[in-house]
């Protein structure tokens, strides 16, 4: 009976050849091994990114509330005083469309969120769509935590991007000081541009993992030069290490305790356990089976103990 691996069943031949060429392997078992190493790395990285997103969005939410709302309020997206009026209007319009036998497609220009921060038209539309989804599920009210948890990571990056358009540099300083209180890099436009560069790299990395794309050639920033794209396993390892450490730097600027918690997490340790040439070779030699990770773990434990 012929044996099929997950890779042979799911991966198109051109993509399979990409892994084969980049990792310089030939046999089916070696290809399966390096592919599984790549997948395990991506899986651990994604969990780290999830932790980062929660920390990042929570801090921005707090900063926006602090700078745009009354004390002890967090309604910078939708005014709490106007929330019920907004829900009622949407409910009426949804009912009217239903009675007319039409689908309901709300136009955000017809609804006022009474936001205390100037959102883009796209963002307003996204929030109106979210509120409509809540209503369809029978919710007549919602919290700002609901909204914060529902929007994409890209929303928070674009929100910071909009700070570039602030007319007064002092406003940029206020926002950056609130969001990254432990930074020592200065709270000006150059600092903001540096943060956005890192965030866009993280977002691109996150999207590649989310779409099951490869993370072999994540670009490495080179000051004053175009990005460098890895061509070997060693270069790939170095590029991923730089990216994850830049993520950790952002978290440290937000809250050093959070960065320490990430460093001590199982996902962080597992990622860097795998992000080694030795681990790559173990997976390559063992077809990426379950024992591959166990061997990597035992090798690391032995080396740590030996030191």
Give residue ranges: language-model regions.
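Extended intrinsically disordered or low-complexity regions, especially N/C-terminal cytosolic tails and loops
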Residues: 1-197, 201, 219-307
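Active-site-proximal loop/turn and secondary-structure-junction residues that shape catalytic pockets
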Residues: 215
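Acidic/aromatic/glycine-rich contiguous surface patches that form carbohydrate-binding/processing clefts
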Residues: 212
């Amino acid at each position: 009976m012929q044996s099929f691996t997950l890779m042979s069943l799911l991966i198109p031949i051109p993509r399979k050849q990409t892994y084969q060429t980049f990792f310089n392997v030939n046999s089916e078992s070696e290809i399966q091994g390096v592919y599984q190493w790549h997948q395990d790395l991506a899986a651990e990285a994604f969990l780290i990114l999830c932790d980062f997103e929660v920390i990042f969005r929570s801090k921005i939410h707090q900063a926006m509330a602090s700078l745009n709302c009354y004390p002890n309020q967090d309604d910078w997206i939708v005014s709490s005083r106007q929330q019920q009026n907004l829900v009622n209007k949407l409910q009426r319009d949804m009912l009217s469309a239903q009675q007319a036998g039409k689908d309901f497609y709300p136009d955000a220009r017809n609804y006022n969120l009474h936001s205390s921060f100037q959102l883009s038209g796209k963002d307003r539309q996204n929030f109106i769509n979210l509120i409509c989804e809540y209503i369809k599920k029978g919710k007549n009210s919602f919290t700002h935590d609901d909204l914060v948890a529902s929007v994409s990571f890209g929303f928070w990056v674009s929100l910071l991007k909009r700070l570039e358009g602030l007319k007064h540099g002092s406003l940029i300083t206020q926002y950056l000081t609130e969001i990254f209180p432990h930074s020592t890099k200065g709270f000006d436009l150059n600092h903001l541009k540096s943060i956005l560069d890192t965030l866009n790299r993280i977002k691109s990395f996150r999207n590649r993992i989310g779409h099951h794309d490869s993370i072999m050639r994540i670009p490495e920033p080179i000051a004053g030069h175009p990005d460098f794209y890895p061509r070997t396993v060693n270069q790939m390892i170095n590029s991923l290490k730089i990216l994850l450490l830049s993520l950790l730097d952002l978290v440290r600027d937000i809250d050093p305790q959070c960065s320490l918690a990430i460093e001590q997490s199982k996902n962080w340790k597992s990622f860097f356990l795998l992000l080694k040439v030795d681990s790559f070779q173990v997976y390559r030699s063992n077809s990426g089976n379950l024992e591959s990770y166990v061997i990597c773990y035992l090798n690391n434990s032995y080396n740590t103990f030996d030191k």
